[in-house]
C-alpha cells in the first residue's frame, strides 16, 4: 500500500478479507475487468525467506507462487496509471489472500461477492509462463479424526490404536476407483497423532482432499469417503469428519471467449520467450468466477519452477 501511494496512486482500498484493491476507471454495468495476484504462500511464518541468486536464478520459498507475479502486478498498476488513457473498460487490480492451503479461496470469494456482477473478465497472475490455465479443478477438503482407547504399548497390547486405524482407513480410501470421464485425484496430505513410541495412540488426525474437473465426480468421491468412514466405525473406533474446504468446478461459461484470449496470450508469450505455453486446468483463484459464469484465465508472468518446495525459483 505504501509503495502504491508513493507512486501517486491515491485510491488504494482493502476489505474484510484483507484483499488490497486498486480501482481504475471503473464503469457502470459489466464494463469492468479484474487482474489479481495472491499474497499468501504455502509456507509457514517460520520458513526462512532469504532470496539467493544461483546460476542467474532468484531462489526463495514462495517467490514464484506467487510473490514475483504480485511484484509485476505492482509495476502494471504503475504503468497503467501513468501511461494508459482511460477508456470504456474499467479495471480492479487486486492483491488477494486465501488462495493457498486451507484458505478456501476466501479472498477470491469475497471479491466476486463484492464485484462479480460488474465483471466481464477476470485474470489471475499465478505461476509460470509455460502454462495457461483455461479451466478449473474443483476440490473438497476434510479433517478426519480417529479416536480409540489406546494405552501402554506392552501392558495394553491388543487395544485399538488410532494410528493403526487411520492407516487402515487411508489404505481403503486409496482403493477408490474414480468414475466418469474427468480426471479425479485424492490425497492424504497431513497425518498427526500419537503420544510416544511406547504408547498405543488414542487419537490420530488427517487432512484429506479430493480433486476433479467434474462436479459429479467430486460428489461420488465424497460418497465413497462417507461410506468408508461409516463402515470403519465401531464401538472401539470413533471417527469424526468435517469438511473444511470446497473449491467449485467450472460453471456455464463462455469457453470460446476464454480460448480466444488464451490464444492471444500464448502468441505474446511465445513472441517474448520463444516457447509456446501449454493449455491446462488447475485449482486457482479463477475457480470462483468460473463457477459464477464469468470468463477467466490464469496465467503466469515469470519463468520458474519448484513451486511449493524450498528450492523454488
Where are these regions (language model features)?
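Acidic/His- and Gly-rich active-site-bordering loop/insert found
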Residues: 1-59, 82
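A short beta-alpha structural unit
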Residues: 19-20, 187-194, 209, 238-259, ...
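Acidic-glycine-rich active-site phosphate/pyrophosphate-binding loop
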Residues: 39-53, 119, 134-145, 297
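Acidic/histidine-rich catalytic neighborhood of metal-dependent amide-processing enzymes
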Residues: 57, 62-141, 179, 209
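His/Asp/Glu-rich mid-to-C-terminal helical/loop segments that flank catalytic regions of hydrolases
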Residues: 79-83, 164-165, 172-176, 216-217, ...
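Acidic-enriched catalytic cores of C-N bond-cleaving enzymes acting on peptides and small amides
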Residues: 156-192, 199, 214-240
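Zn-dependent metallopeptidase/amidohydrolase metal-coordination segment
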Residues: 191, 275-313
Amino acid at each position: 500500500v505504501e509503495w502504491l501511494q508513493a507512486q501517486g496512486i491515491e485510491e488504494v482500498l482493502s476489505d474484510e478479507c484483507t484483499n488490497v484493491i486498486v480501482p481504475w476507471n471503473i464503469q457502470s454495468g459489466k464494463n469492468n475487468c479484474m487482474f489479481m495476484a495472491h499474497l499468501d504462500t504455502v509456507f509457514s511464518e517460520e520458513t526462512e525467506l532469504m532470496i539467493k541468486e544461483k546460476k542467474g536464478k532468484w531462489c526463495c520459498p514462495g517467490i514464484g507462487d506467487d510473490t514475483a507475479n504480485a511484484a509485476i502486478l505492482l509495476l502494471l498498476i504503475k504503468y497503467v496509471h501513468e501511461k494508459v488513457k482511460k477508456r470504456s473498460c474499467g479495471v480492479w487490480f487486486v492483491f488477494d489472500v486465501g488462495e493457498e492451503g486451507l484458505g478456501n479461496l476466501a479472498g477470491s470469494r469475497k471479491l466476486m461477492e463484492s464485484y462479480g456482477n460488474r465483471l466481464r473478465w477476470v485474470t489471475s497472475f499465478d505461476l509460470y509462463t509455460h502454462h495457461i490455465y483455461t479451466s478449473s479443478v474443483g476440490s473438497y477438503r476434510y479433517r478426519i479424526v480417529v479416536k480409540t482407547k489406546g494405552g501402554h504399548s506392552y501392558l495394553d497390547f491388543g487395544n485399538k490404536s488410532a494410528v493403526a486405524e487411520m492407516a487402515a482407513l487411508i489404505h481403503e480410501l486409496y482403493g477408490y476407483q474414480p468414475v466418469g470421464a474427468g480426471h479425479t485425484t485424492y490425497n492424504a496430505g497431513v497425518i498427526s497423532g500419537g503420544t510416544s513410541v511406547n504408547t498405543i495412540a488414542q487419537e490420530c488426525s488427517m487432512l484429506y482432499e479430493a480433486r476433479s474437473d467434474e462436479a459429479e465426480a467430486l460428489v461420488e468421491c465424497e460418497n465413497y469417503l462417507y461410506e468408508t468412514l461409516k463402515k470403519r466405525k465401531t464401538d472401539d473406533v470413533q471417527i469424526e469428519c468435517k469438511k473444511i474446504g470446497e473449491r467449485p468446478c467450472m460453471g456455464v461459461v463462455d469457453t470460446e471467449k476464454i480460448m480466444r484470449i488464451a490464444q492471444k496470450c500464448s502468441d505474446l508469450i511465445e513472441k517474448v520467450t520463444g516457447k509456446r505455453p501449454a493449455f491446462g486446468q488447475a485449482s486457482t483463484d479463477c475457480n470462483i468466477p468460473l463457477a459464477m459464469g464469468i470468463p477467466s484465465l490464469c496465467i503466469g508472468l515469470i519463468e520458474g519452477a519448484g513451486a511449493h518446495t524450498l528450492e523454488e525459483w
